[in-house]
Amino acid sequence: MELLERARQWASHDPDPATASALSADIEAAERGDEEAAARVGAAMNGPLQFGTAGLRGVVGPGESRMNLAVVIRATAGLCEVVTRHATGTPTLVVGCDARYGSSEFAAAACRVASAAGVRVLALPQANPTPLTSFSMLHFDVDAGVMVTASHNPAPDNGYKVYLGGTVAQGDGRGVQIVPPFDAEIAAAIEAAPPADEVPMNDDLIEAVDPREEYVACASALASGEASAREDLRIVLTAMHGVGAAITSRVLSEAGFSNVSLVEAQSEPDPDFPTVPFPNPEEAGALDMAIEQAREQGADLIIAVDPDADRCALAVPDPTSEKGWSPLSGDQTGSLLGEFLASRGMTGSLANSIVSSRLLSRIAQAHGLEHHTTLTGFKWIARAPGLGFGYEEAIGFCPDPAHVRDKDGIATSIVAASLVAALKAQGRSVWDELERLARLHGLHVSSPLTFRVEEIEQIANGMARLRAQPPSVLAGSPVVEVSDLSQGYRGLPPTDGVLVLTEAGDRVIARPSGTEPKLKCYLEVILPVAEGEPLPWDQARERLGAIKGAFAEIIGL
């Protein structure tokens, strides 16, 4: 069917007057020869927005390829059809949303579609953090959950994240994001759903719920150590213009961290994220305002939660840094938290993703704990058998899987603050603890190499070049293993990626991003530390630099 005719049909079934009229206006302009309008129509109708294990995520706008009311309505119709098929008795669904553009409208529509489909709906308060939705999965023992969020994506984006539990998913998958084959089953049901304006909607089975008090109690209970040490810790907290400021401040206060200073300019939800180029605490410059405030106030710790508060970044004083502060990498934080929890008698296993540092496995071994390596994403990490703590290098941490089976930046802030408070009380720093771990287990240094692309085909081309001509030597060390992760790897399900391992133990994993137009390479080198000698940082940086140069040439982006 001709593009403009398909677009015209979509617009005629779009129940949102704003997106329907915007698409219709572009169709009319395109018919008059307006090339820019024609390009916008092409982008809006470039195939249905794909539903996968991450749910939906895309730019907010009109058409089948964007995040909008019509897409959310049809997605919810498909989800409810699948949940009803698998549930025992009346299915239950919890729905939450952040404060991005369209979030509250999308969540309200999801509630009304589910209600009309015979699903009992628990509607969370508007503008809530993702961990509250994750918490609600287990707290209310529901069959499914929807969180409308694009997490730390740029301002124009939104998304639709799906969890399963209750009678639909039990065991290690209860309360966790979807994995295959549920993603394909839901995608097929969405494709079979009627046009959005023909999907029934009502309010009959919607009930407002608010489990914030219960969540605050669980998260604040993760605090440990002397009360005086917690009171003595000076924290600067930023929520990156998201929904996490009030609840994270409350949890820290309930946990005994009374000396918390908010970055006020970033504390109120604002979908434009005006003070940061990207609302991602990992991005360069994202913590500048927090660092400036921390320097002025003589703080001990910066905690940054991302816009939906499921991820947590830390920064600490660093006398070697020009700014006097340095952020910790996800691997540094994950290793510190894993060691901290294990040393305090944590039961259960430690787990991290295949692209995260191998240091956690050595920490687990030292404490007599099981360790599990998983595929990337908490849909896999949270399924690790007997999980006690899990993390991924992209500053996602799960410190309380008994209550939240997903990454949780708010709960993480409590464990991290407890760790830094305990170190301060001993007269030690985070850097001292990282050095201790390096001397015990070897210096593990990880670094990303990221290629952001304009055309998605460039990612596939780069991966194809790597598979066709993998390196034989990296940083002077022979390559001893090249594994295509799409064929499965050491018992893990297949995933798009390539792992390269050298004789020296250097490792690179290349994979496409699941949420952004990026090809990501995850590098890690491990060096032994001689007793009484300085840590071999220069050697590690030299090896990482050589590996980055080689991979940039191979991938060709």
What is the predicted function of each stretch?
Residues V94-D157, V251-L314:
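N-terminal small/polar loop signature for handling phosphorylated ligands or for N-terminal nucleophile
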Residues M45-S65, A150-N153, A239-I247, V251, ...:
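Conserved phosphate/anionic-ligand binding catalytic regions in large, soluble enzymes, centered on
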Residues E2-A110, L205-I235, V243, G491:
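An N-terminal, well-structured beta->alpha segment
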Residues Q50-R66, G89-V94, R112-A116, A193-E207, ...:
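Gly-rich Lys/Arg/Thr-decorated short loops/hinges at beta-loop-alpha junctions or inter-strand turns
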Residues R295, A299-L301, V305, E322-S326, ...:
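Phosphate-binding and adjacent anionic-ligand microenvironments
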Residues W10, D14-A18, R40-L49, N158-A294:
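Gly/Ser/Thr-enriched, mixed-charge loops and adjacent short helices
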